[in-house]
Amino acid sequence: PVKYARAVDVNSAANCIRWYGEAVDKVYDEIAPTADTALALITREPVGVVGVIVPWNYPMIMAAWKIAPALAAGNSV
């Protein structure tokens, strides 16, 4: 189990968190495609507190899949 955690779980969790860290500056204040006479600005606001349920198998990557986007959006977990 420790061998698999080091080889898969830890690396995958780090990559997931790194991906959301890179993506966070690319999702705010986007301008949605509209007609020439309209402007639609996409804003995302934090929801607040996010609760996550993580299964026992590969717990780090499962937690990263849920925690990283919540933190990137400005929520607390």
What are these regions (language model features)?
Residues P1-I31, A35-A38:
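N-terminal Rossmann-like NAD(P)+-binding subdomain of aldehyde/semialdehyde dehydrogenases
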Residues D29-V77:
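Conserved small-residue-rich beta-alpha loop and adjacent elements
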